[in-house]
Amino acid sequence: MAIKTKFLGSAIGSMPFSDVGHAIDVSLSKLDCPIWPQLSFFGLKEQMEIQYSEGIPRAVIDEVKGRMSFDTTGDYSDEFAVFYDAYMTAMDPDSGTGDCSAMAISEEFSHGIYALEKRLKANGKKLPWLKVQTTGPISFALTLVDENKRALWYNEEFRDVIIKSMAMKCRWQIQKFKPYAENIICFIDEPILSAFGSSTYVSVSRDEVVAALNEVVEAVHMDGGLAGTHCCGNTEWSILVDAGVDIVNFDAFEFGETVAMYADSMKEHLGRGGLLAWGVIPTSPAIREQTCESLCAQLEKVMDNLAATGISKQTIIEQAIITPSCGTGSMAQDDAEKVFEMVKQVSTAMKKKY
């Protein structure tokens, strides 16, 4: 991989808007690499994990309580057999068809996917870049629980199904948008990695996390996609590098110095052509006080901090992407509008400077 993104502007999936057409307008007008918007306004089915639950055996959505869990009781061997048959038919490296429609996301679960597809089809020309996204298998399996409120991660049978389901959902999205973009980025969002190593998840092994993430990354590569991982807090960034992600996305406004603590991993990542997505645009009320100039200064500071470890500043520049620090789904709409405007302005200003 030798792609030079040089401050390409993109974003995390969630948006606070109630008008899907407006969300698409913002995405296409403010971002070099547009996204399909995840719109929680439309209800439970566009919530971060539930949005990716269709087709997974034993998922139970409780509309009244506003949550989802998995039923692991009784005999589920037939349901798993159907799942694995669909998985192998699609994903077998020698004879797989690549057809991942068994894990499709319907319009009921994503207004944004279908609204963006319709707009791009009407536009009739390919975009240079497009970004899709999936909740990562670690966050999915550690957040969702069984009937005993035990996280699914600790059930190895269900964990494997979830990893493979997320892999297929990534491929399905890439395949869906391939006719409309030259390059597709697929983010595997792993917010829970900010708690990795804490007492809550002390029994979660690093090797298992790396292996789970790598399995999804490899699926993204099957369809020629670039695999990124977003984590909005601090984490052990070397995990993402060891998992083989192409893009490491982090909060460069609050935690921008933390990547330099993993200088050897960052050097390895950039050396193999990997990209760093600097989430320098805050998705907190702090956005109200920020200007393009203040955010460019913050970006320069954290890039220089990484360069001080011995990594070429020119390499950092050429392999940089600009994003918000997290999704904007929980923000006031006016604040979210400013976030996307700042992505555009900072991206433009940094390209002009370098």
Segments (PLM) and residue ranges:
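Alpha/beta catalytic barrel-like cores
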Residues: 1-151, 274, 308, 318, ...
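Alpha-helical structural signal in soluble globular domains
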Residues: 30, 119, 176, 215, ...
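Short, well-ordered coil/turn segments that N-cap beta-strands
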Residues: 31-35, 125-130, 180-184, 222-227, ...
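C-terminal interaction module
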Residues: 35-43, 240, 247, 299
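Short amphipathic alpha-helices and their capping/turn segments at secondary-structure boundaries
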Residues: 109-126, 166-182, 263-269, 296-314
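Active-site loop segments of alpha/beta catalytic cores
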Residues: 132, 151-264, 278, 282, ...
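Glycine-rich beta-strand-to-loop/alpha-helix junction loops that act as flexible
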Residues: 135, 189-191, 323-326
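Catalytic-face loop-and-helix region of soluble metabolic enzyme cores
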Residues: 246-353
